[in-house]
Each structure stands twice: as structure tokens, then as C-alpha cells.
Amino acid sequence: MSESWQQPPQTQPQQPQAPQPQHHAETPPALAEHTLPPGSAENPLGCAVYGILLQPDPGLQPPQHAPLQAGEPGPKCGVCGHDLAHLSSPHEHQCLAGHDRSFQCTQCLKIFHQATDLLEHQCVQAEQKPFVCGVCKMGFSLLTSLAQHHSSHTGMVKCSICDKTYKPAEAAEPATTTAPSLPSAPPPANIAPVEQPEKPYSCPVCQKPFKHLSELSRHERIHTGEKPYKCTLCDKSFSQSSHLVHHKRTHSSERPYKCAVCEKTFKHRSHLVRHMYAHSGEHHLFRCNVCELHFKESSELLQHPCTPSGERPFRCGECQKAFKRPSDLRQHERTHSAERPFKCDLCPMGFKQQYALMRHRRTHKTEEPFKCGLCEKGFGQPSHLLYHQHVHTLETLFKCPVCQKGFDQSAELLRHKCLPTSTERPFKCPVCNKAYKRASALQKHQLSHCAAAEKPLRCTLCERRFFSSSEFVQHRCDPAREKPLKCPDCEKRFKYASDLQRHRRVHTGEKPYKCPSCDKAFKQREHLNKHQGVHAREQQFKCVWCGERFLDVALLQEHSAQHSAAAAAAEGAYQVAACLP
């Protein structure tokens, strides 16, 4: 849309007039009363206050209206005959009668009667925000959203073209284009809007502040669980419309985001941005300033719990358990109290964790799509319906091959231990004449009479042999249980080589762990650590007279008393010597 819409010819062109100085009233006018020129070469259909740029489709021409002739009552539309005398410009009339409509989307070929409708439609498709607030420079996709946003500014705002002031709170309608063209001028640098609180809206539940009322409304759905945006193709619902738009792409093959390098397409913009890292070579764009870790996405950096050297600064006041994140501490503190902040909106029950509330809410669901064809009873899962139908058919799916007892579930059959009621033992061993009730028990017994060579399966750890693979699997021999390592001096067995090496020092007398403060040595490291605590305590209590150190403060006090007594005795002897002639 590089070409601009040329204005229809006028029979009585107006003479250009010099711009008159503006005399502003004491009370600033509202935005609806504020007039702006129809546009410039760069913005022929736009409003300089709202920052709107409107251009029609270049491939289509607007319906041409008949020019005004002398003696005629007034201009009329050449297509529909609509009277245009009350309009300041023929552009304000969009003809609805002709089929040659002026504003058509180049992507989906949808036709619009007004340029603003086309612009809003294209912005939603391309996820652009061309409607910019003149106060805070915030962008919006819809003009109505910008008008609603203007009500949040209560300070006086200057027009960027004619320097008039107006109240954005009264801006319910966009500015009209009835005034003559004025030269554009930049706004004065010394005039700024009145500062407002950054986040004036707060959540009544968790007191979290927000800058815009729409953000607060979207946040409140977290507490209420409301999901007003439902998918028409499945039963899923979402709390935000953008989530629904992303979800709908899973039902279709639409992939609107295309890589300009390799022409690979994606369903979501975030996937395309992540893919572009492969071409740019910047695989980790976000870096933590504390631990120097890199992340591909900013969300990963924000969720990264940076705690250098494994620190856990958040400690519970009840049990002194430490945590890395304050959220983990708050979640843990609920175990010590009766607080249940997650309440069910259908019953008075409360829960300490959110996942417990979500699991409980499933019990309130009344949807039972699986109906029984005989009694019309409904079930939430097809397996529950299958088990229920056994009541009508009197059939059991799982039967015991020994006693023919039936069970509804396979787990009940596995737990069933079938034992014949009679005391007969018809299965006898031909070697030792021992009798058994089952043939499987006799076969298992006969393996005990087999020679070692007849057992093909051998454990490589304990050298035991087995006849069947099931026995070999159940054996589960591993070094952690069998203690395969044996001491060559006392034949004591150990599980691990480190245990055996530590034990060998008993026989060799080796003491590899030496104290750096004294000449003592130890066989085990834990003994050295315990000994070094003695030196640490010695450093705490030092005598100020002679520098000697002690393990206990009582010993230091007793030692200091000796210095005090000696000093007192020396002072008394000096006084006596001074009195003698």
C-alpha cells in the first residue's frame, strides 16, 4: 500500500490562506471538539494525535462522486445518490451501493466499507499495533482500544500539529477533519503530561499491582479459574484469547510464520524466534550476571534460581529447613499451619497446594459421556463402563484356570491364590517320594536333585547355578549384597574396595592423614577432622598476659587469676620496700 488515495476533483478550489494564530480558551476543549487537518502527504487519512496511518487498497478505486455544478442544490453520490451537502469532504461518505468497494484485504480478500475497519483487520492478522498513544507511546491493534486507553491519562495533552490542549479523558471519539490545513510543528519540549502512578490497579486477592485495568481483569481469572474462551473444535477452554488463537493452530495445518533464510514455516512466532538462533549463531542470548549461566529464552533466565555455591538463604522458622527460593519456603510453611489458601468454589473444602485443588475439582464434574445401553447410567471413563456392564451380563473377564473362579479385574486374578480344598497330593517325586498338590511344585522340587552340570545358568558373582531362567532372574546377585571382596589377612569380607582399603590399615598400621598443626597422624579422615576441632577451640581462648591458649573459658579464667595474684603480690612487695627507711 505505497500509493495514496487521490482526492476527487473539486469545481471550486479553495484559496490557500495564511495560518492564523491560535487563541486558546481558558478551559481546554475536549478531544471531540478539537479539529485536525485531513492529513499530509505522509499521512493522508490519519490523525496526528492518535498516530493513525490509513491508506486504501491501491488495486481498487473508490466510487467517484459527481462534482458540484452551478445551480444544483448540492453534491450527491454518483453511485447511490446520497446527499453530500452536509459533509465537509466527500471522503466522509463511503458508498455501500456499488460492488466496487474501496478497502479490500490483500491476504484474505475480505472487503470493508471503511479504511479503519481494514486497518484494524490487517493489524490483527499481522499482530501489529499501529494505533499509538500520544502521551505514553503505547501501541494498540484496535482504535477502540486506544480510545479506551486514553481515559487512563488525566493530564493535559498538547496536539502535535496546532499546539492546542485537550483532556484525553474526554476523548470518546476521534478528531474530525473540518479545519483548514495548518503547518505541522513539533510540540514544545518544556510541556510534559502530569505524572500518574505506574501501577494504579491492584488485585483484591493477592494485592499484585498492574498498570492497566485490562491486565488486572486478565490476572483475576487466575484466582477465579474462569476460562471464557472456548475452542469450537474440542472441549478445551482458555483464560486468554491469545492462548485460544495459538491452540487453534494445532487443529489446522496453518503455519503463518516463515523463516526468511531457509523458508521453514512455524505455527507460532516464538518458535520462529527460537529457530532464528540457529542462523545467527547466538544460541544463548540471556546470561545470568551472578553465575554466568546462559539461556536461550528470557523466561528460562527469570525462572533460574541463581544460588552460588548451593546457598539456601530462605530458612523455615519452625524446622530450620532451608530453601533456594522464597516460593518454595512459602509452600513449605503451609505444612506447619492450617492455612489452605486454595478454596473450591463448589464446596467448602480448601487445599494447601493448587494441584490438589485441580484434582479435587474433577470430582464435581457432571460430564458422563459414556452411557450404559441397558440402564442409562453414565460414566466418565470407558473402562468404568466396561466394568459396569459385567453386572448385566453376569460374566467375568478373568478366570482362574485351576478353580474356574471369575474376576472383573486382572489385578484381582493375580492376587488370587488358588488352593484346592482337598488334602490329596497326587504329584510324587520318583527320587524321594515327596508328594505335592500341584505339578508345578513337583517340577520345582525335582530341580534340587539335578547335578550342578545339568544347570546351565551360572551367576558370575557367586558361582551359583540355576536350571530355569526365572530362578536366575529372581536371584539378582549383585556386589552390593554379596560382599565379594575379602581381606587376605583375616578373611573378612566387604562390599566395596574403599571399605577393604580402610580395613587393611588395621593390619599395616598406616596413618596417611596427618594434622598440619601438630605431629599426630590418623588412619581415617573423619578422625583427623575430629582432632582438628581441638585446635580450632584452642584458638578461641587466649591469655592476654602470656599468650597461652586454652580449650575452655574456665581454664582461661583460672589461668588469668594466677597472673592477677602474681601481679598483686609484686605490687605489695614494691609498696613495702618503698616504706622502709
Curated annotation (Swiss-Prot):
Recorded coiled-coil stretches: none
Cellular compartment(s): Nucleus
SUPFAM superfamilies: beta-beta-alpha zinc fingers
List of residues that carry Phosphoserine: S280
Zn-finger region bounds: C2H2-type: 75-99, 103-125, 131-153, 201-223, 229-251, 257-279, 286-308, 314-336, 342-364, 370-392, 398-420, 427-449, 457-479, 485-507, 513-535, 541-563
Top-level lineage group: Eukaryota
Cross-link (Glycyl lysine isopeptide (Lys-Gly) (interchain with G-Cter in SUMO2)): K129
GO molecular function: DNA binding; zinc ion binding
Function comment: May be involved in transcriptional regulation.
PANTHER family according to UniProt: ZINC FINGER PROTEIN (PTHR24408), ZINC FINGER PROTEIN 672-RELATED (PTHR24408:SF34)
Name the UniProt record assigns to this protein: Zinc finger protein 319
Species: Mus musculus
